[in-house]
């Protein structure tokens, strides 16, 4: 396997401090906007906000910096001092530690701090505990305001800090350079800045964490140096402890959170450290291994303590240590993406008032709620994968034989309260007698404590998590019974509520109530088998290979080795360019809008009669046929491209960026990205553990320290081997930049000196920049040398991919969406007897069942039927895509892909297809959906919620999430979206004798079905990705270039549609009414589109709902709704007087044209088939040409 060689680029960064404390008067404008984007709990004066130019930092803010992190002695006598500089980038979050109360809370949920403290104790994680000497020397927010000349009651103080040194501030290893204060302008406001520097500046050659920072007599302090007062602010230190260190501690299974902070800080200061960073006394969670078997270690299952599993525990801590080291490397990286600038956000264009701007931001954040819900409720989400299991040796007879898949991550949220074990497997004192929940089959309810743990026990992040969950659908769209919040609150006035967090007046907004409303979607951990990881990431490139055939005939495959052609010539002959030409021509014909691929363009004005339909379909067919023929001619004759092999190797592919500024402008979204990255890092590290253990005495006390560097190097060697692409940079200081820093002798209130010399500690940076995700286009069988288990798995998949040998309903075929949309124009008389409303379901069902009276069909009708049937049969014969087109864009792309598959002799199996579930937002569809935001609770809850619904414009955050699906991913990916998808990382060696480990990031599934997202369906031939677009919202738009199968309303309705019949619409409506009852009236056109993926039927459903409400005189009545549906069914079931019927079954067959319809029908059918290509024959295209002709030509096919 060839990989791109590592390229080294020189990047110049300015020297500077490792952070700033910003102080400003509370802004009059933009406060509502900042509140929406921030994470804040109502019971705390602190918050986490995003770093945004124009909102929290000034214009021109440099994201990358060579931060001063220490000093070193130089010169012959070691008397001179130079500064040590470390490249890094600023954290995408800023930390508000004074004045946070001026920001509106993210949720009205009460007592979140109490919930986090309770959860922390319950799961055994350490609490924040400042030392007495820290408290004695605290720098309070009031004191800083006084120095800056700000009113403490109206001031806002927040920390802007580099990514790698947040923990250093948390453990008081920094100081404020008060003499270096300056002023900047944010918006129209003047803002003070105080630089933050490390205490290590005053300790030359000391590259470690200072354990006692307030000891001014430390022996490492340089002679005559004026040691400053360390910066300790209790609210800030606690905020960093909870929001920064807490999530990492949960992900790495480290109960001693303070030790994680010190380990991360040490890795930041000491670039040469390679040994263990996490403490030796780390504890482990006790649980039964997967499949109900006892825990096991390779050689010591029965003799290393009562629980066994020694190697499992060792792999757990070493993989966590390696992941922490890898995260530290990424935190020191220099990235290209600038920080977000609110003045350039497209979503704010034209929004003149602060309320309108806040409303636009609120609507966008509600989009992201769908992705947050998927990460919380998917059972294989990175948020839940917090424990390590052991599958045992690959070869039971040879325990030393390494396996990449022996150790793996499993969901641990529900077992986090189990007893803790020490290194030897003994229960830690204090945990005796605790019950042990099983890894599989437990009965634990997902509760507020679990949600707090997912957020690292940070009340601020928990508040923002609830902000998103309050905007998630509880299951109504898939037919689940959603809790009546009003009734629940009213009934709870007489009963006890187990949360102990709320009162009757605040119960509607309580975290417990929100989780109760979403109870039907709670994750259910029914399996602990090794599988995919549900990750949150960001697509930051407008380029992706997500067309129907992926990267088939891509630039890299067509480029000649001699480099004799220019890039443009090669690109014009790729499959990608051919699809772009087809879409451009369709757009020129006004059939499609490339920016909105699901739109019908101007077809409503173009298709005014049946002749126009013929023209549209023929134009699409001829256009695609022409492009495919030209493409294949260029590939075969011009480039001698191995077109069949190219198809077998084709992949759908995209890349997820690790650049922190590509994530959404919200602290919680940044948390999801961080937890996803940590899960990926640990997965890679765990794959190397067994190889490190093989042949070693793992029981030795010094094993971890000795072999942690070995594991770390193995993980670093995985870069650029197919999955984790890395970048190598040479870092240099900006030209002419002076190194300004505090004087080492004059004190921290003295002005900065610019006479320092400095050296960059990490001149050459190698760090991962993106994750590559791919999915094979073709279903691949097991290779000849695959294991028996692998062959069995492939055999079980074959039936899912096997193309059935049945004729497809015309309305479910390639032209179904046009026939339903334009039925009244194409067949104006195609309506049931006694009805004035043309009905496509009735018409085509009767026609295909040979029940349609022939007298109802005109000569023109017969010609059109012949045309439609012939095209549908031709398409069906070559179709290997398990999806029916829903619009012209999909029809053209599917037809094009099928034509290429025909040239390549593809047969038997469906190909893999991609579907994007696009997150959207809307105002609350019902009063119930707005209950959590009601200004008053208790007895006045319903009235308060109705008042809010009556004045939605005054509530910019009152939006809820929704979804729509799209099967053409390239325009979706061009919007550079935030995504959630399943990721399975396979590892394998290269050629024989090569010990290089390659990986592949395989596009997999989210587990949890409709719990994760209501539009996910169980279909092995489809890969899903949840997407929230960024381009056009928070960044500039670019030009276009397996859980268990769950029976849901969505699948029930699509099953009714698939069965067909004249009464499809009424059957769908009846099923929905029986499932949802009065909630049916809440479904908007967007909900119906999401459920049915059929625009015509969705409009029919809205009409049924309107008629049902009219029948009930404005009130919903299930009886009235069913009556309306049954009347519609009776209408379309009438076939009129008996007589000769139209024989659709025989109509259109090649041998029966004349007998069935006479000359006219034969001519119509013949005309419809003129453009058909001859079938592709021959096993060996080379064998069909003349013997003397060596090159393959298209005519041979």
Swiss-Prot record:
One of its GO terms (cellular component) is host cell nucleus. A zinc finger (unnamed) spans 499-512. Signal peptide: none annotated. Transmembrane segments: none annotated. Residues 1177-1197 are annotated as: Disordered. One of its GO terms (biological process) is DNA replication. Residues 1172-1197 are annotated as: Required for nuclear localization. InterPro entries: DBP_sf, Viral_ssDBP_head, Viral_ssDNA-bd. Its main location: host cell. Keywords: DNA replication, DNA-binding, Host nucleus, Metal-binding, Zinc, Zinc-finger. The keyword Membrane does not apply. It is found in: Host nucleus. A motif (Required for filament formation) lies at residues 843-844, 1142-1144. Pfam families: Viral_DNA_bp. The keyword Lipid metabolism does not apply. One of its GO terms (molecular function) is single-stranded DNA binding. Single-stranded DNA-binding protein required for DNA replication. Plays several crucial roles in viral infection. Participates in the opening of the viral DNA origin to initiate replication by interacting with the origin-binding protein. May disrupt loops, hairpins and other secondary structures present on ssDNA to reduce and eliminate pausing of viral DNA polymerase at specific sites during elongation. Promotes viral DNA recombination by performing strand-transfer, characterized by the ability to transfer a DNA strand from a linear duplex to a complementary single-stranded DNA circle. Can also catalyze the renaturation of complementary single strands. Belongs to the herpesviridae major DNA-binding protein family. Homooligomers. Forms double-helical filaments necessary for the formation of replication compartments within the host nucleus. Interacts with the origin-binding protein. Interacts with the helicase primase complex; this interaction stimulates primer synthesis activity of the helicase-primase complex. Interacts with the DNA polymerase. Interacts with the alkaline exonuclease; this interaction increases its nuclease processivity. This is Major DNA-binding protein. It comes from Human herpesvirus 2 (HHV-2). The gene is DBP.
């Amino acid at each position: 396997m060839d990989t791109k060689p590592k390229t080294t680029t020189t990047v110049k960064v300015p020297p500077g401090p490792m952070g700033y404390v910003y102080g400003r008067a509370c802004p009059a404008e933009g406060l509502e906007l900042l509140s929406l984007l921030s994470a804040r709990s109502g019971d705390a004066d602190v918050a986490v906000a995003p770093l945004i130019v124009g909102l929290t930092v000034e214009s021109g803010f440099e994201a990358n910096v060579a931060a001063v992190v220490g000093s070193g002695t130089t010169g012959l006598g070691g008397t001179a001092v130079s500064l040590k500089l470390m490249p890094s980038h600023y954290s995408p979050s800023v930390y508000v530690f004074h004045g946070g109360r001026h920001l509106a809370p993210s949720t009205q949920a009460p007592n979140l701090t109490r919930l986090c403290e309770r959860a922390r104790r319950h799961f055994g994680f350490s609490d924040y505990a400042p030392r007495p000497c820290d408290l004695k020397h605290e720098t309070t927010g009031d004191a800083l305001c006084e120095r800056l000349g700000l009113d403490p009651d109206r001031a806002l103080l927040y920390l802007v800090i580099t990514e790698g040194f947040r923990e250093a501030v948390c453990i008081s290893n920094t100081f404020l350079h008060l003499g270096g204060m300056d002023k900047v302008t944010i918006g129209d406001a003047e803002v003070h800045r105080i630089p933050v520097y490390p205490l290590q500046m005053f300790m030359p050659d000391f590259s470690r964490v200072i354990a006692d920072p307030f000891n001014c007599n430390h022996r490492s302090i340089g002679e005559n140096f004026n040691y400053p007062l360390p910066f300790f602010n209790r609210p800030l230190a606690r905020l960093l402890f909870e929001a920064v260190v807490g999530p990492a501690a949960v992900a790495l299974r480290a109960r001693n959170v303070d030790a994680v902070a010190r380990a991360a800080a040490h890795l930041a200061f000491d670039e040469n450290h390679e040994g263990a960073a996490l403490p030796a006394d780390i504890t482990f969670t006790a649980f039964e291994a997967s499949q109900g078997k006892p825990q096991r270690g390779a050689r010591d299952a029965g003799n290393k303590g009562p629980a066994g599993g020694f190697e499992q525990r060792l792999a757990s801590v070493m993989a966590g240590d390696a992941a922490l080291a890898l995260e530290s490397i990424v935190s020191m990286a220099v990235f290209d993406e600038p920080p977000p600038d609110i003045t350039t956000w497209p979503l704010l264009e034209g929004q003149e008032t602060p309320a309108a701007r806040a409303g636009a931001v609120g609507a966008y954040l509600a989009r992201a709620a769908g992705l947050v819900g998927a990460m919380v409720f998917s059972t294989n989400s990175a948020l839940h994968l917090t424990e390590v299991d052991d599958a045992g040796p690959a070869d039971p007879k040879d325990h030393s034989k390494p396996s990449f898949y022996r150790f793996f991550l499993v969901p641990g949220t529900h077992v986090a309260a189990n007893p803790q074990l020490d290194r030897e497997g003994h229960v830690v004192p204090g945990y005796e007698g605790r019950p042990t929940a099983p890894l599989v089959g437990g009965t634990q309810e997902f509760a507020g404590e679990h949600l707090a743990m997912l957020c690292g026990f940070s009340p601020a992040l928990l508040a923002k998590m609830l902000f998103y969950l309050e905007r998630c659908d509880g299951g109504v769209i898939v037919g689940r019974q959603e809790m009546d919040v009003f009734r629940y609150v009213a009934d709870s006035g007489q009963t006890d509520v187990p949360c102990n967090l709320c009162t009757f007046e605040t119960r509607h907004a309580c975290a417990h109530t929100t989780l109760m409303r979403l109870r039907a979607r709670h994750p259910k951990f029914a399996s602990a088998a090794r599988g995919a990881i549900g990750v949150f990431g960001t697509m930051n490139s407008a380029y992706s290979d997500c067309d129907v055939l992926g990267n088939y005939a891509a630039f890299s495959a067509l480029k000649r080795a001699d480099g004799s052609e220019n890039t443009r010539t090669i690109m014009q002959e790729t499959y990608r360019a051919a699809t772009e030409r087809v879409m451009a021509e369709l757009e020129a014909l006004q059939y499609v809008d490339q920016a909105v691929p699901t739109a019908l363009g101007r077809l409503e004005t173009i298709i005014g009669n049946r002749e126009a339909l013929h023209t549209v379909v023929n134009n699409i067919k001829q256009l695609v046929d022409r492009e495919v023929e030209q493409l294949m001619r260029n590939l075969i004759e011009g480039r001698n491209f191995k077109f069949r092999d190219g198809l077998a190797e084709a992949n759908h592919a995209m890349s997820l960026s690790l650049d922190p500024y590509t994530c959404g402008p919200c602290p919680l979204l940044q948390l999801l990205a961080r937890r996803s990255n940590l899960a990926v890092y640990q997965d890679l590290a765990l794959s190397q553990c067994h190889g490190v253990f093989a042949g070693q005495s793992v029981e030795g006390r010094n094993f971890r320290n000795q072999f942690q560097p070995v594991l770390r190097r193995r993980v670093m060697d995985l870069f650029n081997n197919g999955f984790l692409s890395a970048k190598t940079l040479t870092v240099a200081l900006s030209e002419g930049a002076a190194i300004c820093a505090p004087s080492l002798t004059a004190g921290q209130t003295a002005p900065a000196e610019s006479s320092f010399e400095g050296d960059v500690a990490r001149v050459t940076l190698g760090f991962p920049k993106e994750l590559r995700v791919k999915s094979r286009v073709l279903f691949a069988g097991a290779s000849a040398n695959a294991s028996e288990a692998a062959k069995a798995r492939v055999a079980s998949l074959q039936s899912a991919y096997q193309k059935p040998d049945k004729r497809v309903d015309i309305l479910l075929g390639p032209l179904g969406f046009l026939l339903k949309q334009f039925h009244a124009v194409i067949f104006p008389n195609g309506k049931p007897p006694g009805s004035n409303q043309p009905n496509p379901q009735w018409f085509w069902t009767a026609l295909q069942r040979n029940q349609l009276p022939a007298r109802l069909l005109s000569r023109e009708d017969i010609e059109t039927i012949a045309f439609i049937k012939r095209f549908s049969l031709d398409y069906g014969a070559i179709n290997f895509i398990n999806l029916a087109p829903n619009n012209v864009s999909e029809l053209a792309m599917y037809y094009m892909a099928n034509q290429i598959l025909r040239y390549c002799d593809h047969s038997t199996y469906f190909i893999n297809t991609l579907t994007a579930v696009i997150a959207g937002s809307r105002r609350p569809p019902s009063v119930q959906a707005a209950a959590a935001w009601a200004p008053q609770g208790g007895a006045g809850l319903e009235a308060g919620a109705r008042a809010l619904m009556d004045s939605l414009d005054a509530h910019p955050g009152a939006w809820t999430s929704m979804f729509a699906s799209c099967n053409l991913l390239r325009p979706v990916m061009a919007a550079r979206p935030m995504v959630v998808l399943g990721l399975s990382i396979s590892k394998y060696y290269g050629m024989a004798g090569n010990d290089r480990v390659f990986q592949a990031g395989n596009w997999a599934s989210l587990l949890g079905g409709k719990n994760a997202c209501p539009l996910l369906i169980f279909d092995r031939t489809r890969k899903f990705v949840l997407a929230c677009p960024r381009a056009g919202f928070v960044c500039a738009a670019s030009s276009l270039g397996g859980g268990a199968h769950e029976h849901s309303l969505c699948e029930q309705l699509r099953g009714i549609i698939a069965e067909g019949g004249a009464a499809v619409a009424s059957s769908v409506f009846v099923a929905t009414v029986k499932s949802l009852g009065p909630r049916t009236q809440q479904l908007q056109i967007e909900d119906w589109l999401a459920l049915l993926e059929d625009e015509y039927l969705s409009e029919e459903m809205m009409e049924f709902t309107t008629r049902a409400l009219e029948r009930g005189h404005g009130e919903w009545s299930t009886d009235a709704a069913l009556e309306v549906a049954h009347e519609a069914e009776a209408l379309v079931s009438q076939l009129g007087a008996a007589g000769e019927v139209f024989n659709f079954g025989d109509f259109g067959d090649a041998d029966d044209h004349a007998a069935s319809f006479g000359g006219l029908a034969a001519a119509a059918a013949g005309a419809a088939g003129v453009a058909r290509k001859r079938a592709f024959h021959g096993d060996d295209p080379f064998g069909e040409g003349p013997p003397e002709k060596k090159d393959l030509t298209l005519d041979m096919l």
